[in-house]
Every structure is written in C-alpha cells, then in structure tokens.
C-alpha cells in the first residue's frame, strides 16, 4: 500500500481539508477464461465469514477483526467473502493492510421465495423480474459500490446470495459493469437459472458442487472461470477430503479455488439458571 494524501483547497488556494488514504495498485483480468492477478493465475484459498462473536453477537469490534486476520494468516486463508452483506467499514481497511482478497457481497438473499419445501420452484421469486424491486436492488448495489470502491483488496463484487436470477439482478450486474472499475462480477444464482448465464456474472459459481461436478463443467467447453463461492461445509468436526478439490487446481487452470463454508461456528454463550 502507498500513503496517498489529498488536499482540498478553496478558490483562494486556502487549505480546507486533508484526506489521507492507503491505496494500492493491481491488475485483474481474464485471459483465455482464466483469472489473472498482476499477471499470475489467481488461486483463492478463501473463507466465508459472518460477523459474529459469542458474547456480542453481530456487534464485533476491531479486536475480533484482528484476531480473525491473524487466524487467516496462520491457516493460509488468502481471501474472504463477506457473506451475505457488507461488513463493518474497518474490516475492509484491515483486509487492504493484510493483503486479503475480498469478494464484497451486496445485501441480498431471498432463497425462501424460490425454494419451497427444499425444491426449486421459482413460479414466484424475489426480486426476479418484478419491476417494483428493481430500483431497490440497484440501490443496494450502489450502496455497496460507493462505500467500498476505493479498497484495493476487493477483487469481486458479488450481487447477493441465493436469490435465483431475473431481470432485476441482471440490472444489478449492469450497474457494476457500468462502473468499469477493473473488478469482476460474481453471482451464483445463474447456476439454477441458466437462461441468464450469459447476462449475469463473469465467473461460473456454484455451492457445494462435488469435485466430479467441477471436473464435468471444466471438461465440457467451459464458458467462464470457475469459483466455488461455498464448499466443504466444515462446521463441527469435518473438512475431510478437501484434497479432492485442491488436486483440481493443478489439473484445471480455469478452476480458481473458492471459499470454504464457513469461518467459525456461530454460537452464543448462555448461562444456565442456578
């Protein structure tokens, strides 16, 4: 990072304000369907992270954030997805400082509208292509972008989580495309509504695809680089067989890794009645 200092002066050249900022430079691009960062293939050994602490709930402090980053580095985690909402502002500065890649997710999740009794049934889904929702979801995308657009650590803008796909999310995708800020757009929902796969998301994204399913996609004239936005559901005593995914990184350049679900088990400390 570089220390940048912006001086704001009035028409008489009198200093009004000084704005310091830590900025960085990086180049993100897709070449032959492979994502490259500064000329090198991007490999994500990432994690999904909710904002949570057993005693404070979602009201975490910078102390907990720094502990998280320390554990990231100890466990070779190089990326984080802000599932499923923008996080506290200090977290983005800390990821800039620590060199942690970010997938900055927009605050949108509606899988209860198109998944009914565990089955995909999208006859009515939100936001879908409902005109009344369009401006609302674009507003959420704009809030995410305008708040965090200057953070070097953000490589991906994510349109949300498990919200199917329709014209409204396509409009969100177009909003981020119009910013032309050198980042990539991610959205997993097109994997369940393929009619939008050429209109939404610059990466193929899946949740909990098996290694064989990843291999099958990449062996069949794949259209986009592949990112697992959630995989290896590792709550409790699990995470076995992860080498099956890691081996794919060596065989398929288009497989870029992913984000384990999830960082820590979210639990609450309660005191039993005496």
Predicted regions and their residues:
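N-terminal carbohydrate-binding accessory modules
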Residues: 7-72
